[in-house]
Amino acid sequence: MQSPGSKNNSKKRAEKGPAQRLRQRTAILILLILVLGFGAAVLRLTYLTTVQSSELQESAVDLQLADTTVSAKRGTIYDANGNVLAESASVWQVVMSPVNFKNDKQRQAAAKGLSEIFDLEYNDVLDDTKQQSHYVVVKRRIESDEREKVLKLIDTLKKDYSCSGVIQLLDDYKRYYPKNSLASSVIGFTGSDDQGLEGIEYEYDSYLSGTPGRIITAQNARGTDMPFRYEQNVESEDGNNVYLTIDETIQSICEKYMQKGVEDNNVLNKGVCIAMDVNTGAILAMVTTDGYDLNNPYELSAKDKKKIKSTAKSKQAEAESAALSNMWRNKAVADTYMPGSVFKMCVASAALEENLVNEKTSFTCTGSISVEGETIHCSNISGHGTQNFVEVISNSCNPAFIQIGQMLGAGKFRQYYQGFGFSDKTGIDLPGEAEDSFWKEGKMGGVDLAVASFGQNFSITPIQMITACAAVSNGGYVVQPHVVSKITDSKGNVIKTVDKKVKRQVISDDTSKKMNEYLEYNTERQGAAAGYISGYKVAGKTGTTEKRGVTKFESSFSEDYISSFCGYAPADDPQIAMLVFFDTPDGDAYYGSQVSSPVFINIMSEVLPYLDVKTSYTDEELGYVDASAGDYTGVSVDEAKTAVEADGFTATVKGNGSTVISQIPTVSSGLQKGGSIVLYTDSNSQSETVSVPSLIGLSPDEVNDVASAYGLNVSFSGATTSSGTSSSQNIEAGTSVSPGTVITVSFADSSSTLNE
């Protein structure tokens, strides 16, 4: 029998056993958790320090550094002679360091000053002053006048509020186009971020844009910027400079006469002019009329604004976008058109190359031709009768060219179409080049071949046509057109040159020389209607295209046309080719000979002398060659009169002075021999004016006589031969001008016929 004490001890052991075991299990569990947790931590730490080490280091750096981009200076765009067409000028960027403000008065003064200078909302600027940062951009690309205001504000904050180091001016750049709208469709423009959006600015953006710099600012543990002394500046690298093949002088001449052509002929859908070096493919000028100001590329014309305003409000945004796209569009590259009769130079070249024709091959035109039951008319509805191959080209006879196309057949026709480069993009270094539209292989029927033979019912780009024209003239070589000649770095070192690239030879040199001869004959025979320029051998072809295509073979056509002229000079040593076309002339005339040829003549009459192309006058032409006025000022009246007469002119003295103070025409002005030089001896005598007479419809001699009777001078262009008749004058009849003023008169050969 147990004692009471033994019972109590047993009871205590019984009570203690479960509790102790529970505590032991709890301790083991805690220990196990600690071991597993520590093991996981070790494994995680090992993973982080090995596998994710680089990633975490980068993340840590990102948390400690604030990285701000600094603009690079965009490269300059130059013309062929080094004239600046686009440049980035120095402007400034206004930035704040808000954490440097010491009190609300400083913040309020800064916010008030900045909001007034830049016309910003005061509360928005005040909110910026409260940011925990050392770098907040207030305004980008400010110019000198605003910079001066900011400098005054900085000075005021320092003097009146003991606030310094808060506002800074950093270097920035703004794009400028010193020639405004010149070559706008070629150069293009940049956006607000200085990225190229159109033209060369877009195509060569990677070269022009440069490499931005950086401002790296250290941050403290709270995530706010540390003082400026903890900054690191990485300098930006300026962009490269791009040199164009475009010649500013030639471009200006082309734009001047093309715009006049648009106005004179009420052209509804713009005009295009391309001037190209036939041997290298360098584009000397490229014009799409109705250009825009590159410094303000979103400003539409009054005509476009009026049209948009008349549109339903729900459609106005869409209409504005379409109007801008049309304004920026480079029609010379991005649009296609039916070339019409200018394409005949390619068809004729192909037939010659295949020995299917020669200059004596005879064709008969009765005024129409039947093809697979369809009657296709000639522009000369009475017919050209019997004509040889050279006359066929000059007569631009559609029935004869249909026969030539049939001689070639659809297969050979396609072969030369491809050979001249029409089936592929030219590869010109401009954005948005369009593709041609032609019959698929095996799908060209007899009627299709017939109308294609005179340039209808298929579409090509203007740049393709001028490239093919160059191949006709240069020995048959298809050269790739280009508008950039070289690229230099910011120090002037050449890093890239664009060399001549010959794709293929499509016709032989012999065929090319024959075509030069035949197309020159066309110009001589047709006179100003086909690009005749006194003193120069010009080869060329007119074109008048029905825009709807030939779908009904009638003698009457639709009212919408494309008027064109494509030619080159000198014919015996081709250097420059030019295409001129106007889309939908809506004036009194629409034929290429009436609308485009005169513009071609006016442009080439200035461009060829500028390029130092030698003249070669006939004896008859020599009688009407302009002479240049000398400088007759600053000497006595007697001395001036002697010099004037020695130069082959007559002198007319105005005023009572003894010394010549001014003259009309001015120095180097071109005028006919025997013309009158007006010498002024005092300012009072310079107010006299005369009314310009009509000089249209006269022979060269008659024009000289009428101008002389009015005390005016004349300068001649075009067909200045005995059969020439004046067709236009640059100053309208009835205009008041000073005595001695030079009137430029253009002549057409009155013996020529209208052949398109």
Model feature map: region roles:
Residues 115-119, 155, 191, 209, ...:
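Sec-exported extracytoplasmic/periplasmic mature domains
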Residues 3-5, 86, 220-234, 279-342, ...:
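Beta-lactam-recognizing serine transpeptidase/beta-lactamase-like catalytic domain environment
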Residues 498, 535, 549, 580-756:
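Ligand-recognition elements built from short beta-strands and adjacent flexible loops
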Residues 70-73, 80, 88-91, 133, ...:
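Extracytoplasmic
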Residues 124-134, 267-280, 364-366, 430-434, ...:
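Acidic/histidine-enriched alpha-helical segments
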Residues 72, 101-108, 140-145, 194-198, ...:
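Soluble non-cytosolic domains of exported or imported proteins
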Residues 1-309, 336, 411-419, 531-534, ...:
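Periplasmic/cell-envelope proteins involved in peptidoglycan metabolism and beta-lactam response
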